[in-house]
From Swiss-Prot:
Positions of the catalytic residues: 173 (proton acceptor)
Gene Ontology CC annotation, any one: vesicle
List of residues that carry N-acetylserine: 2
Phosphoserine modifications at: 2, 16, 454, 768, 781, 809, 824, 827, 938, 1171
Main EC class the enzyme belongs to: transferase
Protein known as: Cyclin-G-associated kinase
Protein's gene: Gak
Length: 1305
């Protein structure tokens, strides 16, 4: 990349910079960079390239401006190339025609925030590219011969300096775009990224492979138009060395003279043969004709050397009486000079220091390009307008800065934010500590206090000893007690006098200052969410660039001062493990990671899992998740940092290991609910993340935790324990009512919705008080299955009623308020974070909050135990039907009879998730009453429920009682295990009812002790079948009276069990009812008429009907019946009962013999439609589970399914087409017919056999281009499709040519 290659493209408007540069500008511009002894402030972006950005930076000490080149690299080869470029520039620096090297620095991937190695290269700042000056000058006429002489001579002097090195340095990328014009008007050569000291001498001994390798390397570092004949044709066996720079100089001289390149199209044949032409009628530049011919010789040995070129130029200059080393003032004069019009910034004298106290930063932003803007005068008003539009966006971020040259912003009239006030050597920069003191003393004499959040300190006497040193660590959120103490201290200072102001600063006045100010705004109840406060800070100063943990701690402050405050508890928390799902891709192969963890509590590191490299487990993407076991107990501010371990050869020899930070998480344990088992963090909740490609989709981090039941009081009393919230009022932030109304109109109504930076979701409409206090109707469950089920659910954080109690007296004493200002409550981990002076409190004001809104906790918790039920709710409309927004305690559930709630408004899901009281029996209103929550019960308990039918059908049929009905109070459990007693119980009688086949059937039920085998708990688990909800396994006669449309009814005597053949079955348990002991699982499936075609209608009670049980994909024990298929009625046909020997055969026919199938329907009749799942009900699971066929089975399918939601269907089709065939021209051509649009008939599919030789590939490629060329599809609906196909084929063809157009065999 060339230095300042596209600097002036910025003038075209704000859209000229790419997205990456725009993001980098917001992240890097404004920062302070230290390079050696220089401290630089990055001011703006000048240009961007493939992997580098160029900024304008200013030395804070001298005010001198530099060009700062920031190069990013993620490969070792690029690292070596960048280091070589720096070495060459450093070696060549000092020549008057080579850009001046100043300093350089680098950091590795592990230390960089971008996940790539970063290199900083500091050089002198030039005025611009020569090519841009030439374009403007040539609009008025051709260049003079003297100007060309100066430009070319100075360029050759720079090349001569390179060739004089030992060994000679070859630039290899000389072109007019790499020539800069300095502020003094001289030529500066730049961009040594392609330079080398290696020459090549090909001969007949070189193999084709070696020639191809050399050609590829040279092609990668040269520009096509400037390539020499020996490079284009390596088989000419000409030496490739310094003479290639002479050829490039000849092209530059030709371009300067005739305003066009001699090989404009880069045609190889013209270059190899040296076919260029000098205009015959040219008389202006005849003095250069021989020089051009001497430099553009095809044979490099015949070309002039750089010494000969310089000597001829000196002779020409002497003949024309021109000093070739003099500045090229003609370019500057014709372009408007250095700044001879308008109020543009004055150009400093050469080598002289810049007076930094002259103009305000606003003036610099108003004219950010200084005198260079003058060259745009005359006919370029549009460019100047775009420049002003671009500058206005920068001005917005500093529009509220104080007058003078200070970087200070007023968030409100009583809260100011500034950058670090410097002294000593840094006294020349903007925020000089003396200037800051004079400004504050003049504007707020004796009524300002300074809060220093940075770890650096200065003399507090500069600000009359009213300085609070907080000492917050960088790149992490502040400790909660320090943040809360700071808010109390600022509040006490503002209350002391209505003229008092708070001045907050960190190093740059961004992240740390934003956390302090936003937390204080929420502390004073101006806002109730972090997002609203951060938005106000961004508008009043600049985007703070804070991390998710910063927002999390601001949310903590919001919780602690809410209408119903949440006080952090003092219970220790056991962190069992850290689980990352899916596995992040941090290995070099991007297929997994080798993680280890460090945990800090406060400033102390309490544990690390780092071991020897080989002893740490490596997780692959196939593992699905990465688990780091911890097992440590923490309390307070917890910082968890996850690293990826890397091993290098040198590290192995020295027993060292390189680590790369993957992410970090910070939170406070006091806000983790007492019954939480998992703390979830999504990808956007993590701090210090690497590039997004390393984190798979839906990546999240789970902390498996357990909060201990007992409190562990800390050594120091937390500051929130003795704080009264009654005096908190947003009026204290403003000087008058008008200011408050203005802020309120801009930022307070309505409060801004939450952004993805915080997990807590914001509800735009505040919920009613009734909805907020609604709790669960179900008692607490202690079932382990319940815990397992709820572990997969995300619930709102449980609010403890204890946190709503105010432990302080209504009035706070003056001593307590004064204590806010001293350092008595500072913990051991923090620096003194309170003002040194004592402050007297002012009168408290009690007004409602500015903007109240419902809030949720910043973290998502998996609650292992559900909350207790709510008290009875009187109005029917307020009942929580689904129990999804409920919170609870440990109080027992009140009976529904006492609550007076109708059955239709009962919590419908509580019984699925909670057991009811064992002593009470639900009436018909208790729709899901049962002993054990069915969705959470184990398979044993599901099969152990009783199935006797007792009582009668309720008068009102509830639409939800298809799930289950409550057990009766007079049902007694069995005294001992009886596996089949319930099946043979003659008391099981079903009442007549209609059960539609489209409804879901109930879960199977049997005796209480079925499969318990005597060693399971004897708690009665009872579910009773009703007439509207028959029991499938409680007795086969239950289904007898179900009236369904279907085939003709089959008369059967009432009360008799029949086998599938129509004969009376022998006494004993039915084989279909005892499937667990029957060796033939298909013995009862011979009658397909009953299992596939539905149930006959009108059967009397007590008759036997074979039914089918459909096992759902969720592996639960629910059963359903198939709807009756319409068609010809099947008359009953007597079949012999199957013999036992046939049932016990290992190879039997599921369908049976022909004589067992009944009468076949005519072949011409309409056949029933059979799907792939229709026969699943014939084959039970037999203890095996089956995955969902409709769901994705691989990670690739999951990604495709996610991509298909918001991607164009044809683009998906195109992605499927190129998958596995990227840039493979043969594979793409052979499958082209699969991706063409409908109606395209010109393309004839070809096979791989038609694409063996390069000629065949070329022929088919041209045919394909004729079919899919976008020009032929203009205006057609498939125009976009043609473009995408054409681009893929074109890229594949280019790759095919680059690889040498090799045959297939």
């Amino acid at each position: 990349m060339s230095l300042l290659q596209s600097a002036l493209d910025f003038l075209a408007g704000p859209g000229s910079l790419g997205g990456a540069a725009g993001r980098d500008q917001s992240d890097f511009v404004g920062q302070t960079v230290e390079l050696g002894e220089l401290r630089l402030r990055v001011r703006r972006v000048l240009a961007e390239g493939g992997f580098a950005f160029v900024y304008e930076a200013q030395d804070l000490g001298s005010g001198r401006e530099y060009a700062l080149k920031r190069l990013l690299s993620n490969e070792e080869e690029k690292n070596r190339a960048i280091i070589q470029e720096v070495c060459f520039l450093k070696k060549l620096s000092g020549h008057p025609n080579i850009v001046q090297f100043c300093s350089a620095a680098s950091i590795g991937k592990e230390e960089s925030d971008t996940g790539q190695a970063e290199f900083l290269l500091l050089t002198e700042l030039c005025k611009g590219q020569l090519v841009e000056f030439l374009r403007r000058v040539e609009c008025k006429g051709p260049l003079s011969c003297d100007s060309i002489l100066k430009i070319f001579y100075q360029t050759c002097r720079a090349v001569q300096h390179m060739h004089r090195q030992k060994p000679p340095i070859i630039h290899r990328d000389l072109k007019v775009e790499n020539l800069l014009l300095s502020n003094q008007g001289t030529i500066k050569l730049c961009d040594f990224g392609s330079a080398t000291t290696i020459s090549h001498y090909p001969d007949y001994s070189w193999s084709a492979q070696k020639r191809a390798m050399v050609e590829e390397e040279i092609t990668r570092n040269t520009t096509p138009m400037y390539r020499t004949p020996e490079i284009v044709d390596l088989y000419s066996n000409f030496p490739i060395g310094e003479k290639q720079d002479i050829w490039a100089l000849g092209c530059i001289l030709y371009l300067l003279c005739f305003r066009q390149h001699p090989f404009e199209d880069g045609a190889k044949l013209r270059i190899v043969n040296g076919k260029y032409s000098i205009p015959v009628n040219d008389t202006r530049y005849t003095v250069f004709h021989d020089l051009i011919r001497g430099m553009l010789k095809v044979n490099p040995e015949e070309r002039l050397s750089i010494a000969e070129v310089v000597r001829q130029l000196q002779e020409i200059a002497a003949a024309r009486n021109v000093n070739p080393k003099a500045p090229i003032t003609e370019l500057l004069e014709q372009n408007g000079g250095y700044g001879n019009s308008g109020p543009s910034r004055a150009q400093p004298p050469s080598g002289g220091p810049v007076n930094s106290s002259g103009v305000l930063a606003l003036a610099e932003y108003d004219q950010p390009y200084g005198g260079f803007l003058d060259i745009l005068r005359g006919g370029t008003e549009r460019l100047f307008t775009n420049l002003k539009d671009t500058s206005s966006k920068v001005i917005q971020s500093v529009a509220n800065y104080a007058k003078g040259d200070l970087d200070i912003s007023y968030i409100t009239s009583r809260i100011a934010v500034m950058s670090f006030p410097a002294e000593g050597v840094e006294s020349a920069i903007k925020n000089n500590i003396e200037d800051v003191r004079l400004f504050l003393d003049a504007k707020h004499p004796g009524h300002y206090a300074v809060y220093n959040l940075s770890p650096r300190i200065y003399r507090a006497s500069k600000f009359h000893n009213r300085v609070t040193e907080c000492g917050w660590a960088v790149r992490r959120a502040p400790h909660l007690h320090s943040l809360y103490t700071l808010c109390r201290s600022m509040h006490a200072w503002l209350r002391e006098d209505h003229r008092n102001v708070c001045v907050v600063h960190c190093m740059d006045g961004r992240a740390a200052s934003a956390v302090a100010v936003c937390a204080f705004l929420c502390f004073c109840r101006l806002f109730s969410t972090a997002e609203a406060a951060v938005y106000m800070f961004s508008m009043k100063r600049c985007p703070p660039g804070i991390w998710p943990s910063h927002k999390r701690y601001i949310e903590y402050v919001c919780d602690m001062v809410a209408e119903e405050p949440i006080t952090p508890h003092s219970k220790p928390m056991l962190v069992k493990s850290v689980v990352m799902t899916p596995v992040p891709l941090f290995s070099k192969q991007r297929n997994g990671c080798r993680p280890f963890c460090e945990v800090y509590v406060g400033e102390e590191r309490v544990t690390t899992t780092s071991q020897e490299y080989d002893r740490m487990k490596e997780f692959k993407i196939e593992d699905g998740k990465a688990v780091i076991p911890l097992g440590i107990t923490v309390q307070g501010d917890v910082l968890t940092i996850i690293y990826h371990a890397r091993s290098t050869l040198g590290g192995r020899l020295q027993a060292k290991m390189a680590s790369m930070k993957m992410f970090q998480i910070q939170f406070h344990t006091g806000f983790v609910p007492r019954n939480a088992t998992t703390v979830k963090f999504a990808k956007y909740d993590l701090d210090a993340c690497d590039i997004q490609e390393k984190y798979p989709d839906l990546f999240q981090v789970n902390l498996e935790v357990e909060v201990e039941p007992r409190d562990r009081p800390s050594r120091d009393v937390p500051p929130w324990e003795n704080t009264s919230l009654r005096g908190l009022n947003p009026k204290i932030l403003f000087s008058n009512r008008e200011e408050q109304q203005d802020i309120l109109s801009k930022f307070g109504k309505p409060e801004l919705p939450r952004q993805p930076g915080s997990t807590a979701q914001y509800d735009a409409e505040a919920g009613s008080p009734e909805a907020e206090i609604t709790e669960s109707d179900s008692p607490q469950s202690s079932s382990t299955d319940t815990n397992h089920f709820l572990h997969t659910l995300d619930w709102q954080e449980e609010k403890d009623p204890e946190t709503g109690v105010d432990n302080t007296s209504p009035k706070e004493s003056q001593s307590n308020l004064i204590a806010d200002g001293d350092g008595s409550e500072v913990s051991d981990e923090e620096e003194a974070s309170c003002p040194s002076e004592e402050r007297k409190p002012g009168a408290g004001e009690d007004t409602p909050r500015l903007a109240a809104g419902t809030r949720q906790q910043d973290l998502i918790f998996d609650v292992g135990m559900l909350a207790a039920p709510q008290e009875p709710v009187q109005p029917e409309e307020g009942v929580d039907l689904l129990g999804l927004h409920s919170e609870g305690d440990l109080r027992p559930a009140a009976p529904l009879q006492a609550s007076g709630v109708q059955s239709s408004n009962t919590d419908l899901l509580s019984s699925l998730l909670e057991p009811s009281d064992a002593s009470q029996v639900g009436p018909p209103g208790d729709l899901l009453g049962g002993e054990t929550p069915l969705l959470l019960a184990s398979p044993v308990s599901l099969l152990g429920v009783q199935s006797n039918l007792q009582g009668k059908v309720p008068d009102t049929v509830d639409p939800f009682d298809q799930f289950l009905l409550p057990s009766s109070s007079d049902t007694q459990p069995c005294s001992k295990p009886d596996l089949f007693g319930e099946f043979l119980n003659s008391d099981s009688v079903a009442s007549s009812t209609a059960f539609p086949s489209t409804h879901s059937a109930p879960p199977p039920s049997c005796s209480t002790a079925f499969l318990h085998l005597g060693d399971l708990p004897a708690e009665p688990n009872k579910v009773i079948a009703s007439s509207s909800h028959p029991d499938l396994l409680g007795g086969w006669d239950t289904w007898a009276e179900t009236a369904l449309p279907g085939p003709a009814s089959m008369p059967v005597p009432e009360g008799t069990l029949f086998s599938s053949a129509g004969h009376p079955a022998p006494p004993g348990p039915n084989p279909s009812q005892t499937k667990s002991q029957n060796p033939d699982p298909f013995a009862d499936l011979s009658d397909l008429s009953s299992s596939l075609q539905g149930l006959p209608a009108g059967l009397p009670a007590g008759s036997f009907v074979g039914t089918s049980a459909t096992t759902h994909k969720s592996n639960s024990s629910w059963q359903t019946t198939r709807p009756t298929a319409p068609g010809t009625s099947w008359p009953p046909q007597a079949k012999p009962a199957p013999r036992a020997s046939e049932q016990l055969r290992s190879h039997f026919s599921v369908i049976g013999a022909r004589e067992e199938r009944g009468v076949r329907a005519p072949s011409f009749a309409q056949k029933p439609k059979v799907s792939e799942n229709d026969f699943e009900d014939l084959l039970p699971n037999q203890g095996f589970s089956k995955s969902d066929k409709k769901g994705p089975k691989t990670m690739a399918e999951m990604r495709k399914q996610e991509l298909a939601r918001d991607t164009d269907p044809f683009k998906l089709k195109l992605l499927d087409w190129i998958e596995g065939k990227e840039r493979n021209i043969r594979a793409l051509l052979s499958t082209l017919h699969t991706v063409l649009w409908d109606g395209e008939s010109r393309w004839t599919p070809v096979s791989m056999a038609d694409l063996v030789t390069p000629e065949q590939v070329k022929k088919q490629y041209r045919r394909a281009v004729l079919v899919v060329h976008p020009d032929k599809a203009t205006g057609q609906p498939y125009e976009q499709s043609a473009k995408m196909i054409f681009m893929e084929l074109n890229d594949a063809w280019s790759e095919f040519e680059n690889q040498g157009s090799r045959p297939l065999f």
